[in-house]
Structure formats: C-alpha cells, structure tokens
Amino acid sequence: YQFEYTGTSDDDLLIGLESGKYDIGTKGAWYTDERAKKFVIPSEPVGASIIGFTVRKEDEQKYKTIDDFAKNKGKLVPISPQNAQWNVITSYNEKHQDAPIELTAAESFKVADAYAWVLEGRYDAFFDIKLSFEKAVTAEDGPYHQYADKLSWFPYKGIPTYPLIHRDEKGEK
C-alpha cells in the first residue's frame, strides 16, 4: 500500500472526510452516534485518549476526581455540542443526576483562552486531553508552559479512539 498524508486541522479533517476530499482520517476521534452516521468507523479502536480536567493548582486538593468537581459545583469551560467531550459530560450527568456538571454550549474558542479563563477564575476547569495538556503546558517548549506552575490536571477516564473513513462504496468495503 502507498498512502499520501496531509496534515490538517481537526475541523478540516472532518469536513474533508465528509466531502470525500480525504478517504480516511486519524485524529484520535471518539465514537459518537453522529459520527457513525457520517463516517465508517471500524469495530475495533486503534488507541485511546485520556480525558480529564485542567484546574488551578490552588484547587488541586479540592478537585481530585470528576465527582469532586461535580459535588463542589465546579464551573466548566463551555464545550461545543458537536465536540465528543460534550457527550462524555452528558453521559456522566445521566448517571449522576444528584450532582450533575453544568454544561454550557460554546461555538468555538482557542485553547489559550480556556487556560486563561481557568487561571483568572472565570471557570474552575477545562475538560482537556492529557496529551494536549502535557504538550501545551508541562512541556518546556509548550506554547503555554508559562502556566505550568499555576495549572494542574487530573484524569477522568480513557476513551477509545478510531480512524474515520469516508462513507461511500469504497469506504464501506
């Protein structure tokens, strides 16, 4: 086999797959019913993303688990309803109706905004992927490393990831 690779943004990848510009995309995509309608998704995952919460270091004793965050009525940075992270929090809330996490819909924002909003106290946490936090904040060459002594991250769970395949006759095979 010979593959042609194209580096692109997450949004462009999804649009490109849907339009047929790309045949397959790997972006650490989580399974959602909406994605399963648009794309062919293999039955077996190829990896996993560890999702968790970026919080202020001063709050790391207060928020050690998702249950702590919910019980303390932590305020979460808004999430786009199209983002698979929305489904993760919705699923948590369905199972924990006594102490749900308030979800606020967002159109879009920059990750730098999310970190800044947590630091300034506008929100208590940003629902973040571990690898993203490590590359952006904890890595010495990370673009937000200046926040490393002010932010902390704790895990929620691992979520299987899948390649997404353009839905057409060729992709169905």
What are these regions (language model features)?
Residues V46-T54, E140-K173:
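Periplasmic-binding protein-like
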